[in-house]
Amino acid sequence: MPNELSERCSVIEECYEFMLAYAGQGLAGGEGNGQGGLIRDFLSRAAQALGGLESAYASVVKQMGLNPAEPYAAFQEVLARDARDSLVAVELALAQPIISSQLIDNLNASIHLRALLTDLFLIDEIFKGIQHRESPAGAAGSAH
């Protein structure tokens, strides 16, 4: 998967992994352990990554010249909606003065975030498969 899209996906996935660990700590929020600042940092970076996810996907599809174009364009709409919905949920969490483990656990459980993560895993596998087929080693290996 080309760089910008890959980087955005990585930031979002890293945030989700940190959120899982944070949710399991049972923090009421505002503790002096520094985790409150870290969760805000992860969420802020994820929000930035979510904001440009659709355009990064569109760039990859265009750059790779993927055809037929219709399924990729239709999925772009799904990805845009899921990214937008996830961004709203992340921004709502960031707007809270205290971010507890329970709040993050509920954010983790959000169907919006789960749908987005599934979208990311799906496009990652699709683009990996395309790149493998187009690489000289992949093309040679598929001839057997």
Residue ranges of predicted features:
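Short alpha-helix boundary/capping elements
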Residues: 20, 47-54, 83-84, 114-121, ...
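General "foldedness" signal
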Residues: 26, 30-33, 60, 67, ...
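Amphipathic protein-protein interaction modules
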Residues: 58-108
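Core of compact, soluble alpha-helical bundle domains
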Residues: 1-63, 141
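Amphipathic alpha-helical binding modules
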Residues: 86-142
